[in-house]
A protein has these predicted regions:
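N-terminal Rossmann NAD(P)H-binding glycine-rich loop of SDR-like oxidoreductase domains
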Residues: 7-27
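Conserved Rossmann-fold cofactor-binding substructure of NAD(P)-dependent oxidoreductases
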Residues: 45-67
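NAD(P)-cofactor binding segment of oxidoreductase domains
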Residues: 63, 82-110
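Conserved Rossmann-fold NAD(P)-dependent oxidoreductase catalytic core, especially the SDR/UDP-sugar
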Residues: 97-140
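Conserved beta-loop-beta element that borders a ligand/cofactor-binding pocket
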Residues: 115, 149-174
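Flexible, glycine-rich beta-alpha linker
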Residues: 119-120, 139-140, 164-181
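Active-site helix of classical SDR
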Residues: 144-147
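C-terminal substrate-binding subdomain of Rossmann-fold SDR/epimerase-dehydratase oxidoreductases
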Residues: 190-306
Length: 306
């Protein structure tokens, strides 16, 4: 991703984090993971603990650290609605503590995993979301991520830290069997011979991006020393109905769909402008069908043909 560096990856044992850590190791960086659980490879140094604990955070950010990639967060909209206080503790308080440790230890770069949910209600059905779209989050998740972005911006402005707020769209890919977002729900439904619930009539537009494209985007932001928000998505919006149809094609399962009312915090549409990331060299490589085909083997019954 850049010259050999000492990198702290918070949330590095998670779905996105594991891919990020592997890429960093391949490029020869010295990596430390801070997470609630150990990294699957025991050779990777892991600090197991809760970053909401000041002692854990202090031990995580060692003198000599060059870069922090902060992926640890409450990432579920539903979980944030159910427990907004816990969401604030991790997404805001822990982020603020890491930024202060970044300042104290003279860490030069801080890459924050954010989300396009920070714009929330600012996205009308015909509006293309850019880095300049007004922040109008609809949920505690979006609000806490917006707060994290503002904290990062203030530290970049006051203390000279290079800080990028990477606004991921809906990330999918191999290794998400424990996730409860829509694509793994489709995969489980195909495996178990069940159906899925589709909120609304299924015509809402969504941008879904493959995890390997996200890793590429993180690298582009780091190499380019990007400051401020940066949208990382596929740049190709699809309807929820198209996602269901593609899952049927990839899995060979019927996956019946039941339409249910739209829930709290649903953005009316997600149509992203990724030109700023492209200017840094970002080139998303996966279309929806190709990407889903990389997810299905993790869920497929033994002997099934992906």
């Amino acid at each position: 991703m850049a010259n050999r560096s000492r990198v702290l990856v918070t949330g590095g044992a998670g779905f996105i984090g594991r891919r990020v850590v592997r890429a960093l190791l391949t490029e020869g960086h010295e990596v430390t993971v801070a997470d609630l659980r150990a990294f699957p490879d025991p050779e990777v140094r892991t600090l197991v603990g809760d970053l909401c604990d000041p002692d854990v955070a202090t031990r995580a950010v060692e003198p000599g650290t060059d870069v922090i990639i902060h992926l640890a967060a409450v990432t579920s909209v539903l979980a944030s609605v159910q427990d907004p206080v816990a969401t604030h503790l991790l997404n805001v308080d822990a982020t603020a503590r890491l930024l202060e440790l970044c300042r104290e230890n003279e860490v030069g770069t801080f890459l924050l995993a954010s989300t396009n949910a920070v714009v929330g209600g600012g996205s009308a059905p015909d509006e293309v979301i850019t880095e300049r779209t007004v922040l109008r989050p609809l949920t505690p998740y979006g609000a806490t991520k917006a707060a994290g972005e503002m904290l990062l911006g203030s530290y970049a402005n006051c203390y000279g830290i290079t800080g990028a707020a990477l606004r991921f769209s809906n990330v999918y890919g191999p290794g998400m069997t424990e996730k409860d977002s829509f694509i793994p729900r489709l995969m489980r439904a195909a495996r178990d011979g069940e159906g899925v619930q589709v909120r609304g009539d299924g015509s809402m537009l969504r941008d879904v991006v493959h995890v390997d494209d996200v890793v590429q985007g993180i690298s582009a932001a780091w190499r380019g020393q990007h400051n401020g928000p940066l949208i990382l998505g596929s740049g190709q919006s699809v309807t929820v109905n198209e996602m269901v149809t593609t899952a049927r094609k990839v899995t060979g399962a019927p996956i019946p769909a039941e339409n249910v009312p739209v829930g709290c915090g649903e953005m009316p549409a997600v149509v992203l402008d990724i030109s700023a990331a492209k200017a840094l060299g970002y080139r998303p490589a996966f279309d929806l069908e190709t990407g889903m085909a990389t997810v299905w083997p993790d869920f497929a019954p033994e002997g099934a043909t992906p």
